[in-house]
């Protein structure tokens, strides 16, 4: 991440700029790079700037990021143009412990993880020294994001010595191969020249009365579902609830735009089963076009089909409901026998580089044995996925059932420690906390395990989300007593109405007191 460039309007420390209470630009860039890269370099101008970034990095407090991130100073700091991006690329190649480097400026606000994935896939095993991205605006190669290999370092050093600082010209001289960003080209042209540009792009942040930053909205597109999971409907779907509400595509688009004006950067589409809604796929595309950085869907995966089309539409995260790897237990819970189909979708998503999370609800009498749980854990640890065990939560229609079947997260901790898993600390200084899940990782194996314990360990203090029901109403708390109507006349009215209602968001739920709110079944809200 190139942090040392001068900017007449944002200054030389632009990477430390935090738009309207958000995280600094450099922290955002590191988050977008995510866990796919074993080494993260912040290339800065000099030792003084390095110290400022070092202090800011410590405030993030993520041990994993700290272990993988190094701050290095520009090798050409005494050159005539020490802030030239080409010098930063050369420095990265010289300092990196790996032979391949992806470079991007700290203020490249339009860059997404998908752009970096396409660069990596496009480069593959090709022998070219560098790869550039094609811009929709310029109809040619743009300097960043770009991929560079070690052999390019000699040419870059010579260009700096000659006073030739253009990265685009360096790409051309080295015969850079072009990588097409596909449907994501327009994002690369996002403007970040001024603080006004940045504030307009990121939106005006929303805080609740308890100081929690809200940046994540969950849309229940429909109450309809093509499964009948036991924990959702232990006695079947009641006759009085046969009508299955569904948001219209126009309502979804209006609300997506409204929440972007409030600085929301993550959206999740849920149900029921969201893919039974005819506008689900278009909603993903709309969210990408509006600038949401994280676009997720929680699904049983039966109707996903080819994951590639979802990736091209803008999907960045796939959450799959999978309660057992045992076909008999799976069918007993879901009333469905297509386990292999779901596993195939998961494997394809992994191959495509989409972030995959597996949601598993344990029932003591069905899939809650230590053998079944251990099998799920071992399967997940062997893959770059996060398997999250969710404590069965009570609703109006499953209270007695939940009490008898619930497996507490604390019961799983011995299985995790036996496999050498250690707890992952969240980034305490970042507004992008890890949410309700307490995560565990292994020092060698790629998978992670998460425990979501709403009953035994209240996580309301980390709440960063709002929910929209399939009836188009705002749910301020998953277990709140009231849903609120929203004025859907325009994105502006949506934003204004949500900002007005946020003052009534409660501090926490009261499940332990038997107050389950107005949720009848999880089919109506999607979790």
Feature-to-residue mapping (PLM):
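N-terminal [4Fe-4S]-dependent radical SAM core
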Residues: 203-218, 228-230, 261, 437-448, ...
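Accessory C-terminal segments flanking Radical SAM cores
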Residues: 396-516, 521-523
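A short acidic, helix-capping loop that chelates divalent metal ions and anchors anionic groups
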Residues: 8-12, 138, 155, 187, ...
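Nucleotide and nucleotide-moiety/phosphate-recognizing core
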Residues: 2-167, 172-189
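Active-site oxyanion/phosphate-handling segment shared across diverse enzymes
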Residues: 151-203, 443-473, 480
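Radical SAM/AdoMet-radical enzyme domain recognition
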Residues: 249-269, 273-390
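Short, electropositive alpha-helical surface patch
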Residues: 52-77, 283-288, 367-386, 445-453
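Canonical Radical SAM [4Fe-4S] cluster-binding loop centered on the CxxxCxxC motif
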Residues: 209-249, 262, 478
């Amino acid at each position: 991440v190139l942090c040392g460039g001068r900017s007449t309007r944002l200054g030389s420390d632009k990477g430390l700029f935090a738009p309207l209470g958000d995280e600094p630009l450099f922290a955002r860039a590191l988050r977008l790079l995510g866990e796919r890269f074993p080494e993260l370099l912040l290339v800065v101008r000099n030792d003084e700037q390095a110290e400022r970034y070092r202090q800011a990095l410590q405030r993030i407090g993520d041990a994993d990021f700290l272990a993988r991130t190094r701050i290095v100073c520009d090798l050409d700091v005494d050159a005539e143009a020490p802030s030239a991006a080409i010098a930063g690329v050369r420095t990265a190649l010289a300092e990196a412990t790996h032979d391949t480097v992806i470079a991007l400026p700290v203020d490249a606000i339009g860059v997404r993880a998908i752009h970096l994935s396409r660069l990596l896939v496009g480069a593959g095993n090709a022998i070219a020294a560098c790869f550039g991205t094609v811009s929709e605006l310029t109809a040619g190669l743009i300097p960043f994001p770009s991929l560079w290999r070690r052999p390019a370092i000699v040419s870059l050093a010579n260009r700096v010595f000659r006073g030739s600082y253009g990265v685009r010209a360096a790409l051309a001289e080295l015969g850079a191969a072009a990588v097409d960003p596909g449907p994501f080209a327009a994002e690369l042209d996002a403007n970040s020249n001024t603080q006004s540009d940045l504030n307009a792009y990121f939106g005006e942040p929303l805080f609740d009365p308890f100081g929690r930053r809200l940046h994540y909205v969950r849309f229940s597109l429909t109450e309809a579902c093509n499964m009948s999971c036991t924990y959702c409907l232990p006695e079947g779907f009641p006759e009085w609830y046969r009508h299955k509400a569904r948001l219209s595509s126009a309502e979804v688009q209006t609300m997506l735009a409204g929440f972007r004006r409030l600085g929301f950067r993550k959206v999740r589409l849920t149900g029921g089963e969201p893919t039974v809604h005819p506008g689900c796929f278009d909603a993903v595309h709309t969210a990408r076009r509006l600038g949401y950085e994280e676009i997720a869907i929680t699904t049983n995966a039966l109707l996903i089909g080819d994951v590639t089309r979802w990736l091209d539409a803008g999907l960045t995260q796939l959450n799959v409901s999978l309660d057992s790897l045992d076909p008999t237990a799976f069918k007993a819970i879901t009333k469905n026998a297509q386990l292999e189909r779901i596993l195939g979708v998961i494997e394809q998503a992994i191959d495509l580089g989409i972030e995959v999370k597996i949601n598993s609800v344990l029932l003591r009498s069905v899939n809650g044995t230590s053998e079944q749980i251990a099998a799920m854990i071992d399967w997940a640890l062997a893959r770059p996925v996060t398997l999250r065990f969710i404590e069965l939560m009570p609703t109006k229609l499953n209270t007695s059932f939940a009490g008898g079947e619930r497996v507490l997260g604390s019961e799983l901790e011995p299985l995790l420690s036996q496999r050498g898993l250690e707890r992952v600390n969240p980034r305490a200084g970042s507004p992008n906390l890890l949410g309700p899940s307490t995560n565990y990782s292994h020092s060698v194996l790629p998978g992670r395990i998460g425990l979501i314990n709403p009953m035994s360990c209240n996580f309301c203090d980390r709440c960063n989300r709002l929910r929209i029901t399939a009836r188009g109403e705002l749910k301020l708390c998953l277990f709140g007593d009231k849903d609120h109507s929203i004025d859907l006349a325009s994105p502006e009215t949506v934003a204004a109405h949500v900002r007005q209602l946020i003052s009534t968001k409660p501090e926490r739920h009261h499940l332990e007191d038997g107050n389950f709110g107005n949720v009848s079944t999880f089919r109506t809200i999607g979790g």
